[in-house]
Amino acid sequence: DLHLSLRRQRQMCIRDSSSQRRNGKAISPSGGPERLQKVLAAAGIASRRQCEKLIVEGRVEVDQRVITKLGTKVDLETQSVQVDGVPLVQSQLVYYVINKPKGVVCTHRDPSGRMRIIDLVPDETARMFSVGRLDRESEGLILLTNDGGLAQQLAHPRYGVEKTYHVQVAGLADRAILQRLREGVKLAEGKVGVAAVRIKRVYKQSTILEINLREGKNREIRRML
């Protein structure tokens, strides 16, 4: 039952969050002078790249002075930072590992009112990032955090972090299918391929493939198959 599964996951997140705070594992982004864009991202304002844009646009102040130079270092222990006139408040870094069930969407805003992955965790004042996405009908591990720096390092293609997917396909997958995936399949945005693919398990009427991707596009695996 979807609702029972969601309730259990939410209870687990609450317990994990409480334990994390008791053990002192959740830390503030301040630990001496850091680059301004890194501080903003770590505080959950936006991704690192979006924070750089905010700085260049003159929307960030340090000690009541507008800062537009990227790489400027600040220390939240001794300096005040404002974004669009709103003071930046140090917040604990929070991490949730979620086993996303089917029927849940990873988008943070859903006009259709469907269950979102953000609904599975306790209410947090900090803005949470979904590191990677799975479509509504897929299930698997998703990381939610307000650590913008970590989110960027895990999700941005230039860091080369591979994501592993187990995909069940109808029938038996032969070597030709695996080779086609390795060489790349032409999609609307161009030719895309996998980092690695292998047959994990074979059933009478279906096959489980293990597929590794370095960069995930919208419903990429479904469209490739």
Locate each region found by the language model.
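Basic, flexible Lys/Arg- and Gly-enriched helix-loop patches that mediate nucleic-acid binding at interfaces
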Residues: S19-L225
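Single conserved hydrophobic/aromatic residue that forms the stacking wall/gate
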Residues: D1-D16
